[in-house]
Amino acid sequence: MIVGMEGIVERRDPTFIHLNVNGIIYEIQVSINTSNAIQEKRVKLFITQVIREDADLLFGFMDTNEKKMFDTVLKINGVGPKVGLAICSTFTPETFAKVVASKDVSMLKRVPGIGPKAASRILVELADFIVDGNAAEGSSGALGEAVMALESLGFKKDAIQKALSGCSGDTSTLVKEGLKKLQRL
């Protein structure tokens, strides 16, 4: 899996770049924010690689928070790379975290390809979206980390939230409590 690339920009469009890495030129899809942030010929990008039956796609980001935002929205059922990139082009990670925290459907509907149903689903799925290790409004950092840890173990977000409701403590305590309660469910 490719997680980063450094090379010389051969061509730059608003939604993709051609990056020459040691003589091999890759087409990398980028958000408009990333495209605007590329000022130098030599650039280092954080990469998300999406492998499909018919394509091997690379998505590049200058900012790790933008990459995290993209990776997070891709996990939502019905949200593909095209919509994920549109979200990254429309919002900065900080703005997106505020939109999610305030559950602002109308702001999310501004993104091309997102209607009212999809916007509502995204807001429900991303209730605990975190930027820069700080939790979005209404969620402590330890709670957000515990939720992510339990999700990485394969538990569903709604079950995790039920299990962790009323719990407090540091991340490891919350994970232990969550595991105990999730085993009973």
Curated annotation (Swiss-Prot):
Has three domains with a flexible linker between the domains II and III and assumes an 'L' shape. Domain III is highly mobile and contacts RuvB. NCBIfam families: ruvA (TIGR00084). Residues 139-185 are annotated as: Domain III. GO terms for molecular function: ATP binding; four-way junction DNA binding; four-way junction helicase activity. GO terms for biological process: DNA recombination; DNA repair. The gene is ruvA. This is Holliday junction branch migration complex subunit RuvA. Residues 1-62 are annotated as: Domain I. Pfam families: HHH_5, RuvA_C, RuvA_N. GO terms for cellular component: cytoplasm; Holliday junction helicase complex; Holliday junction resolvase complex. The RuvA-RuvB-RuvC complex processes Holliday junction (HJ) DNA during genetic recombination and DNA repair, while the RuvA-RuvB complex plays an important role in the rescue of blocked DNA replication forks via replication fork reversal (RFR). RuvA specifically binds to HJ cruciform DNA, conferring on it an open structure. The RuvB hexamer acts as an ATP-dependent pump, pulling dsDNA into and through the RuvAB complex. HJ branch migration allows RuvC to scan DNA until it finds its consensus sequence, where it cleaves and resolves the cruciform DNA. Homotetramer. Forms an RuvA(8)-RuvB(12)-Holliday junction (HJ) complex. HJ DNA is sandwiched between 2 RuvA tetramers; dsDNA enters through RuvA and exits via RuvB. An RuvB hexamer assembles on each DNA strand where it exits the tetramer. Each RuvB hexamer is contacted by two RuvA subunits (via domain III) on 2 adjacent RuvB subunits; this complex drives branch migration. In the full resolvosome a probable DNA-RuvA(4)-RuvB(12)-RuvC(2) complex forms which resolves the HJ. Keywords: Cytoplasm, DNA damage, DNA recombination, DNA repair, DNA-binding. Residues 63-139 are annotated as: Domain II. It comes from Sulfurovum sp. (strain NBC37-1). Residues 139 are annotated as: Flexible linker. InterPro entries: DNA_helicase_Holl-junc_RuvA_I, Hlx-hairpin-Hlx_DNA-bd_motif, NA-bd_OB-fold, RuvA, RuvA_2-like, RuvA_C, RuvA_C_sf. It is found in: Cytoplasm. SMART domains: HhH1 (SM00278).
